[in-house]
A protein has these predicted regions:
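Structural element of the ATP-grasp superfamily
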Residues: 6, 71-75, 168
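ATP-dependent adenylate-handling ligase core
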Residues: 1-7, 41
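Hydrophobic (often cysteine-bearing) scaffold residues that line and stabilize catalytic clefts
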Residues: 2, 24, 94, 160, ...
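Residue-level detector of well-ordered alpha-helical segments, enriched
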Residues: 27, 114, 163-167
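Short, charged, solvent-exposed linker or helix-capping segments at domain edges/interfaces
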Residues: 7, 113, 228-232
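Catalytic subdomain that performs nucleotidyl-dependent activation
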Residues: 12-21, 29-118, 152
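AMP-forming adenylation/ATP pyrophosphatase catalytic core
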Residues: 51-56, 100, 108, 119-233
């Protein structure tokens, strides 16, 4: 929701680059939030310093290697003040509760350095898988247009389960033009159904997924069609 509001503002003002103040502590909190949600390797890897939010906006995070306390010190010394978000103290938010849990974790030796090392190791493994995922996209996917992709069913017999999962997550995100891919569980369920011979048609993550002979067609779901589908439900 927050990114959606900010990105809409940027698009209305023709702003092409959004710089955020995400720091090392944010990375750690993000790691634990996704760990609690049962995220896979991609979710547990570190935040990206540069990401493409959509076709018109890029997000840049230059402070990922800085501690929050250092950024606060710099801000207070140069600008004499900083904006404090009251929600950062509200324990109804998981992120706030995780900050409190971390104090106990540090007593057991799970300090910032060790957590960051773990995140970096996971990120390195994720980059390796992304290399093979990109090769799979080049081999098995053909983009008919910006919002339409044809996939060869041979991917199910020629690639590993993790590569297939990352492949479909990326394709769905690319075709729909959305920043976040669908939830892992939904992508896994889609792959399971696609492997069955009785798959006909489905929608997921703003995309329509259907079979065409020995191929899978993924196309962007038009807004009017999406509204009609919701009304039918």
């Amino acid at each position: 929701m927050r990114y959606s509001l900010i990105s809409n503002y940027c698009l209305n003002k023709d702003i092409k680059y959004l710089i955020t103040a995400h720091h090392k502590d944010d990375q750690i909190e993000n790691f634990f939030i996704r760990l609690l949600r049962g995220s896979g390797l991609t979710g547990l890897s570190s935040m990206s310093a540069n990401i493409k939010y959509n076709d018109r906006l890029k997000i840049i995070r230059p402070f990922l290697n800085f501690n929050k306390i250092d950024l606060k010190y710099t801000t207070l010394n140069y600008f004499k003040t900083y904006i404090k978000d009251p929600s950062n103290e509200d324990e109804k938010f998981l992120r706030v509760r995780i900050r409190k849990y971390r104090k106990n974790m540090e007593k057991e030796g799970l300090n910032t350095k060790r957590i960051i090392n773990t995140i970096q190791n996971l990120s390195s493994a994720n980059q390796t898988l992304n290399f093979y995922k990109n090769k799979a996209i080049y081999k098995h996917a053909s983009f008919v247009s910006k919002n339409k992709c044809v996939i060869n069913r041979k991917i199910f017999s020629e690639e590993s389960a993790e590569i297939i999962f990352k492949f479909f997550s990326d394709i769905l995100s690319l075709v729909s033009g959305t920043y976040y891919p669908p939830r892992s569980k939904k992508v896994t369920n889609l792959i399971y159904r696609l492997k069955k011979n009785k798959f006909t048609k489905s929608t997921l993550g703003g995309c329509i997924v259907e079979e065409k002979d020995d191929f899978i067609l993924i196309s962007k779901e038009l807004k009017i069609r999406k509204i009609l589908n919701q009304l039918r439900k």
